[in-house]
């Protein structure tokens, strides 16, 4: 498929190829639709920041499929801090209406083999990471693993233009970023699926202090 033609697929392999080619992708998450890109592609991140009208200083959230991908990032935590983070990412039998996605600000070790780029961390010395619950996005993250992205990271921000509510469905996501609603050089693809129906908004916490940021 031409990169000038929007991708609409249920294949995580096609979606990962789209991301690796520097494109933006909308996809379902736990509670709302997200939009993201390859975090190690600066041009893609800058385009995403532009359509979201988001200052680079704020930093971006990245998601991955498993804590095992980010072992090096967890080494800066105490055993108690690490367990708190890991416990928040464990799937359980709680009803979706009571579930909440958890993102953690993790300190970046100086000896990290593949460092996290400044256009992802923004003005911070930490990176916002979530092990995502959504099975489809887990598959996508696994497809993103490479020498340059050993963490399987995908940028994750809410799928909406500035001032609009986050999309809750594929149709709503397309209404924001398909066709005339987005510039041709900012072509957005779509990974078809449904959210997990989480009713609580996602939470961001500082792994070192336990402070809830959002």
UniProtKB/Swiss-Prot annotation:
It catalyses: L-threonine + hydrogencarbonate + ATP = L-threonylcarbamoyladenylate + diphosphate + H2O. One of its GO terms (biological process) is tRNA threonylcarbamoyladenosine modification. One of its GO terms (cellular component) is cytoplasm. It holds the Pfam family Sua5_yciO_yrdC. It is found in: Cytoplasm. Its EC number is 2.7.7.87. It comes from the Bacteria. GO terms for molecular function: ATP binding; double-stranded RNA binding; L-threonylcarbamoyladenylate synthase; tRNA binding. Keywords: ATP-binding, Cytoplasm, Nucleotide-binding, Nucleotidyltransferase, Transferase, tRNA processing. Residues 9-214 form the YrdC-like domain. Belongs to the SUA5 family. TsaC subfamily. Required for the formation of a threonylcarbamoyl group on adenosine at position 37 (t(6)A37) in tRNAs that read codons beginning with adenine. Catalyzes the conversion of L-threonine, HCO(3)(-)/CO(2) and ATP to give threonylcarbamoyl-AMP (TC-AMP) as the acyladenylate intermediate, with the release of diphosphate. This is Threonylcarbamoyl-AMP synthase.
């Amino acid at each position: 498929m031409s990169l000038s033609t929007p991708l609409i697929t249920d294949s995580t392999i096609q979606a990962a190829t789209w991301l690796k080619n520097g494109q933006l992708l909308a996809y379902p998450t736990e509670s709302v639709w997200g939009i993201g890109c390859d975090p190690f592609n600066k041009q893609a991140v800058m385009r995403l920041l532009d359509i979201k009208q988001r200052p680079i200083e704020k930093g971006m959230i990245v998601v991955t499929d498993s804590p095992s991908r980010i072992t090096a990032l967890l080494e800066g935590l105490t055993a108690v801090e690490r367990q708190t983070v890991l416990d928040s990412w464990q799937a359980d039998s709680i009803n979706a209406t009571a579930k909440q996605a958890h993102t953690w600000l993790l300190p970046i070790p100086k000896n990290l083999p593949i460092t996290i780029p400044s256009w992802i961390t923004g003005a911070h010395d930490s990176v916002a990471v979530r092990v995502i619950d959504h099975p489809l996005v887990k598959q996508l993250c696994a497809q993103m693993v490479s020498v340059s992205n050993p963490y399987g990271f995908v940028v994750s921000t809410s799928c909406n233009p500035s001032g609009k509510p986050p999309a809750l469905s594929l149709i709503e996501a397309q209404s924001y970023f398909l066709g005339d609603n987005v510039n041709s050089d900012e072509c957005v693809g779509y990974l078809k699926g449904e959210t997990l129906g989480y009713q609580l908004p996602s939470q961001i916490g500082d792994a070192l202090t336990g402070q809830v940021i959002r």
